[in-house]
Amino acid sequence: MKKILFAAAFILSAQFVLAQPNEKYIAAMKKNLETMDAASKDPASLLALANQFERIALAEKTQWLAYYYAAFCQVNTGFMQQDPSGMDVIADRASALINSADSLSPNNSEISCVKAMVATVRMLVNPMQRYMEFGPEIETNLEKAKVLDAANPRPYYLKGENLKNTPEQFGGGCATASAQLKTAKEKFDIFKPASQLHPNWGLQRVDKLLAECK
């Protein structure tokens, strides 16, 4: 009986150790995160960064943040596309990556935010034709993100930006976006990421959108 208990304890201990991020992983992630702002100005650089995060994810296998950032970089290249014909391919890749993150960290507010972003890229291929299909998916993921973590400012930011970019005749514009953006700003003011590797993006964009809505 003691041997069985010892073996079970050993297995649990080994699983715990394997789930912990190692120093090499942390250093690689921090290096990539430090280049994200610069890379975000150029689709090719952002795609290269997505590939770097994916390589980290494949090497580590148990760290959801590497898959998360790979998906985040990938989906943001979709928003930068001039030709909508390639946006579905980008969304497919981002979706696969964020689903891998979801399998490692289910019911995660940050992951739901990126899922909403992926659905937004799909909708932007042809908003008039695709809104009925992807609009509810965007909304569902953003509302889920709010429920999963009430302190997370990003679902409010993403909702506000979506509303700002929606024509007024369809219920959008600054008048409806401002409430979401102001809530996002309030939450950003007190938000503290769980670690230096956890998501902490969006504040600068919220400030810019609020300034545009004055």
What residue ranges belong to the model's regions?
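Canonical positions in the second alpha-helix
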Residues: 56, 101, 144-145, 184
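Helix-turn-helix repeat elements of alpha-solenoid scaffolds
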Residues: 39-52, 86-97, 131-139, 178-185
